[in-house]
Amino acid sequence: IALMLPLSGNLASSGKAVREGFMAAYYQSLQRGYEVPRISIIDTNSAGSLELAYGDALALEAEWVVGPLDKKQVNELAKLQRLPLPTLALNYSDHEAMAKQPDDLFQYGLSAEDEARLIAERAYTQGHRRVLALAPDNSWGKRIYSVFEQHWLSLGGSVAGQQFYKQRKDYNPDIKALLNVDDSQKRYSVIRRLMRESMEFEPRRRQDADWVFLLALPKQGRQIRPMFDFNFAGDLPIYSTSHIFSGKSNRKKDVDLNGIQFTDLPWLLEKSALKQEIEKNHPRAKGGYARLYAMGVDAFRLYPRLKQLSALPHSKIFGVTGDLSMDTEGKIHREMPFAIFNRGRPVAINLDKE
């Protein structure tokens, strides 16, 4: 196996996290007496080009490539008619590049799109039908929201309201606009002018929605969540992607996320001996890079089973990043468990008991 990752340059920290996870799974298999391949590690950043990196892999007598991690390089691969070696890319190509994808290219990563679809399905099975959606006003936020909206509508749900927010210190105007609290206050002002006298008034939020889809990072989420309480919407269930959780428990800060349900990797919600060992040897594995370590673990366990997943359409592998399955284009999709913030801590939800 040639493990092709960026180990220098801008993506070096991410590449090293994936490498450490991959090698930890390798050594665990070795200790258990399983047959393991010889691993050669290639730095895609210093190789000069993807073509040269594959040249190195062939010179090292690799039979498989795991990597690259960089999305631009995965797009390059997807545009080729044939690959020099069968490849498990650790990212997803853009849809435009997918049209003539080579047969021996498989794609696996931590797709936010998968999470958005899962949330739509979870909310629908919980009986919710009309959503209020809040997402960042950038290309990533719009892309993930678009995937969510498409899937939500296909299930039979509807969108009561939607707001894209810019990064700022105060998100109250965005929440008020989404909840139509401003309209309630404007109506009061009109009535008061017409009647020419003061009257008792309590602003109201819109009543045509039964849940909220929130796409936010922890810092924004901690500011946004309390604003729903402040604007008379504390009773609306809020669902979010894994981006709402930093990956490291912080009760003091995350108490502001209480009640938010989110989907995340089993790696972060469950205990395992391998996870404890990785965290002991790599302090960064406890924070923002935790998910990339987990991705490395699953990349090692996934590559020998790709043919099985391809041949058996409904088969799954139970990985540390979720239950993994493959579509007809060779893309790996994940199903993940859900958790809820309770007293500032993420607590796994046992879906079987609901």
Descriptions of predicted regions:
Residues 1-15, 131-133:
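Short beta-strand segments enriched in small/hydrophobic residues
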Residues 13-18, 32-96:
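Beta-alpha junction/loop-to-helix N-cap segments that form part of ligand/metal-binding clefts
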Residues 29-44, 102-106, 153-188:
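Short beta-strand elements in bilobed, periplasmic/extracellular small-molecule ligand-binding domains
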Residues 64-163:
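Extracytoplasmic ligand/sensor domains, especially the bilobed periplasmic-binding protein
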Residues 181-189, 207-209, 225-297:
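Extracellular/periplasmic periplasmic-binding protein-like sensory domains
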Residues 281-347:
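Segments of small-molecule ligand-sensing domains
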